[in-house]
């Protein structure tokens, strides 16, 4: 079966870096070094291998994030409301038909993340496609129609925050990455960062 061709101008990547990083002692996770590069740089490189247009959603250190060469957009709603607020910001700022999201603290991004998510969405005629590692879903790795923004804003304005509940309101497809379960590993503490860096020194990626 031939591979689906990604329409590059129809998908914008949104890197979610807007959290408080409380378990990291408040240090901005996307800017923490892993193998000599900020974690967000690893995510940028992976997404740029598939698509051209990227946005970075951040609520702190905006000037530092801007040095990576992509537009930096804060949450459109105050209060650190979680990933949905960042997704809404990305939808509003993008001009493409779809957005694809990935968090800044998961630097081992899957090969062909965008293509597999896009294939699942098109195949199922879905509104949103979400990554699944074979054991569980990873809802912040997702591709979705940008015209879902009004629905998302209604959800947030109603005081709702849970990403799974909003997804449940729409047609959902699942893209499986059983061959790359490590791709969804995230770094939430200095200890986890040190552990991952040690592993990468032994088995470079």
Report each predicted region and the residues it spans.
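Nucleotide and nucleotide-moiety/phosphate-recognizing core
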Residues: 3-160, 165-183, 190-204
